[in-house]
């Protein structure tokens, strides 16, 4: 395909036009008085959102240079969303301010590489200042306030704080759509996985269609169990102990399954067979998690263990197991707390080293099942459009709350960035590097000014007033009052604020040092087909 090339100022201005088109659509959503954006969908109802990354993803521009500029800013929003779960609009506003101020200086003759170095040093200094000023999140109320700001709804913030209080910081909080109106919170006690009983004959509570085993032995097998002679030696020992048995294996079939079912129906022996969750290596890892949680061992030929020679000491234990058609819950496994802590540390290290979002998500789920718990927030709304928008807001708020617990919080509303400006005076820079630091100085005011503008206030006046206020005091845009924002519950996770700044600066540096842009040449539209009537007049239809 033919390419088109732009150089120097033309290239940079083309990229900037694309950045501005995207940023102008995104920044109207910033702050408590920000507006929504409606996104057309080819299929189904349109989406209404105030989430920066969702808006950015939908924007496709026609001009090839503008398209590349917009794609670069999409990367800012996406990276910030991946790392912190929020702050995508702030990142976009910062990127726009840095690029605008930077290109003005490049056009005036500044060296782009010097500017880039200055921007990087200034951002490093501001990040250091933000981390030093961060306050640890210690109370349920602080978590609720942080989540409420992200979601724009206090009731959502309260529910997320309650969920985190119940499942702990390592727990998983998922958001599901509900058929009922409003919000509900469901908590899972113990480890739950999405496999149920193999046969309906195992049910012990016909009304609820579930099998409940009190104080059972738990047999974990990495292979299929099909012949009864493999199981018999172990079954006899379990029956003598007078306890029920839960078998979790790759599969239980044939005469082994028949024997278990017949004994259950006759009332001789209570047991339930369940397929192990997952596939391949993930299944092995999850079985090992269960073994550590219940204090048992996985019967596997890889470690030299077989069913025929298995002893009762290899079985795990739990206070209670509840099995439905679709899922199994192990409550209070009898595993050693040190072994569980070691396994948790191992999974956490795997999360740190994982490059795949999917793998990271699955590891996070395993971590939650071992270390915390699982909470499900069910969201309902009057229409499908509102439901999708609400679900998205709750998901963002959950990630925001987790980020707050991780690294602490700073004053919200763009105030923490503005109050970090004096720290740049400590940098001893000269020439273009000093100019680069000044670009950051100007850009740090942009989020606060945009929040003020969206709230119908004069941005310059608000910025001046906040600049002269004590650290942490700023505009509460929801009420229009200048106050101590942390005390008022207006806080941002420092992880979100620093990620937004770091990612914006990274892309701004690329913009400023660009000297040529190579893009695909737009294809000419095919000529319309000729008139089939041959242009004959006098034909009346």
Swiss-Prot record:
Top-tier EC class: isomerase
Pfam families assigned to the protein according to its UniProt record, in alphabetical order: Cpn60_TCP1
UniProt-annotated location(s): Secreted, Capsule; Cell surface; Secreted, Cell wall
InterPro entries reported in the protein's UniProt record: Chaperonin_Cpn60_CS (IPR018370), Cpn60/GroEL (IPR001844), Cpn60/GroEL/TCP-1 (IPR002423), GroEL-like_apical_dom_sf (IPR027409), GROEL-like_equatorial_sf (IPR027413), TCP-1-like_intermed_sf (IPR027410)
Keywords: ATP-binding, Cell wall, Chaperone, Isomerase, Nucleotide-binding, Secreted
Record EC number: 5.6.1.7
GO BP terms in the entry: protein refolding
Molecular-function annotations in GO: ATP binding; ATP-dependent protein folding chaperone; isomerase activity; unfolded protein binding
Catalysed reactions, semicolon-separated: ATP + H2O + a folded polypeptide = ADP + phosphate + an unfolded polypeptide
Main location: secreted
Gene Ontology CC, one term: cytoplasm
Keyword Oxidoreductase: no
Highest taxon in the source lineage: Bacteria
Protein family (similarity comment): Belongs to the chaperonin (HSP60) family.
Assembly information from the UniProt record: Forms a cylinder of 14 subunits composed of two heptameric rings stacked back-to-back. Interacts with the co-chaperonin GroES.
PANTHER family: 60 KDA HEAT SHOCK PROTEIN, MITOCHONDRIAL (PTHR45633)
NCBIfam families, per the entry: GroEL (TIGR02348), PRK00013.1 (NF000592), PRK12849.1 (NF009487), PRK12850.1 (NF009488), PRK12851.1 (NF009489)
Record's function text: Together with its co-chaperonin GroES, plays an essential role in assisting protein folding. The GroEL-GroES system forms a nano-cage that allows encapsulation of the non-native substrate proteins and provides a physical environment optimized to promote and accelerate protein folding.
Stated name of the protein: Chaperonin GroEL 2
Classification lineage: Bacteria, Bacillati, Actinomycetota, Actinomycetes, Mycobacteriales
């Amino acid at each position: 395909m033919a390419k088109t090339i732009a150089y120097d100022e033309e290239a940079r201005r083309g990229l900037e036009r694309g950045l501005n088109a995207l940023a102008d659509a995104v920044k109207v959503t910033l702050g408590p008085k920000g507006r929504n954006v409606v996104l057309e969908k080819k299929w189904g109802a349109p989406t209404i959102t105030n989430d920066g990354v969702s808006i950015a993803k939908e924007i496709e521009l026609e001009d090839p240079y503008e398209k590349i500029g917009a794609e670069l800013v999409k990367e800012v929003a996406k990276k910030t969303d991946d790392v912190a779960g929020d702050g995508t609009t702030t990142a976009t506003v910062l990127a726009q301010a840095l690029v605008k101020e930077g290109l003005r200086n490049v056009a005036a003759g500044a060296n782009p590489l010097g500017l880039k170095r200055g921007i990087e040093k200034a951002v490093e200094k501001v990040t250091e200042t933000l981390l030093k000023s961060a306050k640890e999140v210690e109370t349920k109320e602080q978590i609720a306030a942080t989540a409420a700001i992200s979601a724009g709804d206090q009731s959502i913030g309260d529910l997320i704080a309650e969920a985190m209080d119940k499942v702990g910081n390592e727990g998983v909080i998922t958001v599901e759509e509900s058929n009922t109106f409003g919000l509900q919170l469901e908590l899972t006690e113990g480890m739950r996985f999405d496999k149920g009983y193999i046969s309906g004959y195992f049910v012990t509570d016909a009304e609820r269609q579930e099998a409940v085993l009190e104080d059972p032995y738990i047999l974990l097998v990495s292979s299929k169990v099909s012949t009864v002679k493999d199981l018999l030696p172990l079954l006899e020992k379990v029956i003598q102990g007078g306890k029920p048995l839960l078998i979790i294996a790759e599969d239980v079939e044939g005469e082994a399954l028949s024997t278990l079912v017949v004994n259950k129906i006759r009332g001789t022996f209570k047991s339930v067979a369940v397929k192990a969750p997952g596939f391949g290596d993930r299944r092995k890892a999850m079985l090992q998690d269960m073994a550590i949680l219940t204090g048992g061992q996985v019967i596997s030929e890889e470690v030299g263990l077989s069913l025929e020679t298995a002893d009762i000491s290899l079985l795990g234990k739990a206070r209670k197991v509840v099995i439905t058609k679709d899922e199994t819950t192990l409550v209070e496994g009898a595993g050693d707390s040190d072994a569980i802590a070691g396994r948790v540390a191992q999974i956490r290290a795997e999360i740190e080293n994982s490059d795949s979002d999917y793998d990271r998500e699955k590891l996070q789920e395993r971590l939650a099942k071992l270390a915390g718990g699982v909470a499900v927030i069910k969201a309902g709304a009057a229409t499908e459009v509102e439901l999708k928008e609400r679900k998205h807001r709750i998901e963002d708020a959950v990630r925001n709350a987790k980020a707050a617990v991780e690294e602490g919080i700073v004053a919200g509303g763009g105030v923490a960035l503005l109050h970090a400006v004096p720290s740049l005076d400590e940098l001893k820079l000269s020439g273009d590097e000093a100019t680069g630091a000044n670009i950051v100085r100007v850009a740090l005011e942009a989020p606060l000014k945009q929040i003020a503008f969206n709230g119908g206030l004069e941005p310059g006046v608000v910025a001046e007033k906040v600049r002269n206020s004590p650290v942490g005091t700023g505009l509460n845009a929801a009420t229009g009052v200048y106050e101590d924002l942390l005390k008022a519950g207006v806080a941002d996770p420092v992880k979100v604020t620093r990620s937004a700044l770091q990612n914006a600066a990274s892309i701004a540096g690329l913009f400023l040092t660009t000297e040529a842009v190579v893009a695909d040449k737009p294809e000419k539209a095919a000529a319309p087909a000729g008139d089939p009537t041959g242009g004959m007049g006098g034909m009346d239809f």
